[in-house]
């Protein structure tokens, strides 16, 4: 399977995302904001954040709003995506993985729907890389598509830049993070209710055990920390 070249999609990535997610919420930024708000619930305020696989920087406005004092850095292999991200988010820094200094460490590393693009044989190396970027007591949160959800599978199958996607289950993600010596703090399913059922969204916390959310998250830390908050 050939790898997707995200430089080819950078200029119209936003339009593709909007078309793909319109059925769930007319505001295509809903997903990005949802995840950053959830990250804040999980770990509280932080001084530094790395968005691993940041793409065109769709999470950056929400990271800047919710973590206003943090040093926020995005990294991505797509140079064209980084160029767009820099233009649209002047208060954040954007670098390639090669440009990220060897000593750079962060309180929080987020990877949002990144790992299904990474070949399975390379995933452990990518998780270890993210682990190596954590400060002591830092947190690493992976958000991923839920392969158990049939709607999610349909969307991935029909998304042009998911042509190389190999979905990974929550159990695989947890196992890989544990193998990298991360402590699992919390794992749950999320994104259950579309905009038409927005009145039910406050009840998602009671359904996080149910493997029918559109996505899931796993929050882990670089060592035991009792201060992780329930979300």
Where do the protein language model's features map onto the residues?
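A short glycine-rich, Lys/Arg-flanked "PGG" loop and its adjoining helix->strand segment in the class I
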Residues: 124-136
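Conserved beta-strand signature within the Rossmann-like core of class I S-adenosyl-L-methionine
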Residues: 137-144
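Short alpha-helix
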Residues: 166-181, 187
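Class I SAM-dependent methyltransferase SAM/SAH-binding core
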Residues: 58-99
């Amino acid at each position: 399977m050939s790898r997707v070249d995200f430089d080819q999609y950078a200029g119209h990535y936003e339009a593709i995302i909007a078309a793909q997610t319109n059925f769930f919420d007319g505001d295509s930024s809903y997903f990005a904001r949802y995840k950053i708000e959830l990250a804040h619930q999980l770990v509280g305020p932080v001084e530094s954040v790395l968005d691993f696989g940041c793409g065109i920087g769709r999470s950056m406005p929400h990271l800047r709003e919710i973590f206003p004092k943090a040093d926020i850095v995005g990294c991505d292999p797509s140079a064209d995506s980084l160029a767009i991200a820099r233009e649209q988010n002047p208060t954040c820094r954007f670098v390639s993985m090669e440009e990220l200094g060897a000593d750079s460490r962060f309180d929080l590393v987020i990877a949002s729907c990144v790992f299904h693009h990474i070949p399975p044989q390379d995933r452990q190396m990518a998780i270890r890389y993210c682990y190596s970027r954590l400060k002591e007591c830092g947190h690493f949160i992976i958000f991923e598509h839920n392969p158990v959800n049939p709607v999610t599978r349909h969307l991935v199958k029909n998304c042009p830049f998911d042509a190389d996607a190999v979905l990974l289950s929550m159990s695989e993600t947890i196992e890989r993070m544990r193998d990298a010596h991360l402590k699992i703090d919390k794992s749950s399913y999320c994104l259950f209710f579309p905009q038409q059922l927005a009145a039910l969204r406050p009840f998602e916390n009671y359904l996080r055990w149910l493997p029918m959310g559109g996505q899931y998250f796993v929050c882990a830390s670089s060592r035991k920390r009792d201060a992780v908050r329930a979300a």
